[in-house]
Amino acid sequence: MPKRSLIRYGSIAGAVAFWFLFGLVNEQLQLINPAMIPTPVDVVEAGWELRNVVPLDIAVSLLRALEGFAIAAVLGVLLGCLCGSSRIAEDVIDPILELIRPIPPLAFLPIFIIWFGLGELSKVLMIAFSAFFVIYVNTYQGVRYADPLLMRAALSLGASRRRAFFTISLPSATPEIFTGLRLGMGMSFFVLVAAELLAADSGMGFRIQEARWQFRIDRMIYGAVEIGIIGFILFSLLHSIEARLLAWKPKREGEAS
């Protein structure tokens, strides 16, 4: 296993070990009410209690998050490329998006519920709306600030603007696009949980809310860990795809080890 992977997974194992030891010490010394800080064993037991509903919760939440993320990714990359490569599109579209972008996405959640109801559509569109902006901004910046010398050289040698875009602008913007996709994925899960906490009868966020009503902190932590693990897996998949697409890009010193 590469050295960096050992360090990464070792840090996670160390954090879990510290949590476990602190829980054991706290149970003996009663520094804090043990019900408020369950141990990893308590959390695993809570997950086992929910074993019959967890698969469905994961499937429902994943479907919502991925549907919203897919919409955001398509629109964000397309509009980012359009505004980054066209001054007219930039002048017309970008000011409107920049006006909306500073508003916290959750401020629109009540509006989306009124417009689209409490069903799946409002949650999926809310996720798409929240993830769109980070994807758009990163794509726009990557395309807009592609190497101007290479662009001028390509155009002076007779390349069309379309060809220059696909051979220079888009490849050079790919790292920024993937940065936006990773941030968008994180935003998707953030808004997903918030939406499920407020207006859902299934999903991982709803299960956390149900645990709050029951004052089951062990189940609440289990739900949070569950979301973190799924997010980590999805981020790793995105990182793997990015590494394959950017195999041509020089790596930083020591990155491959």
Model-derived segments and spans:
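Glycine-rich helix-loop "coupling/hinge" segments at transmembrane-helix boundaries
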Residues: 114, 143, 190-227, 246-256
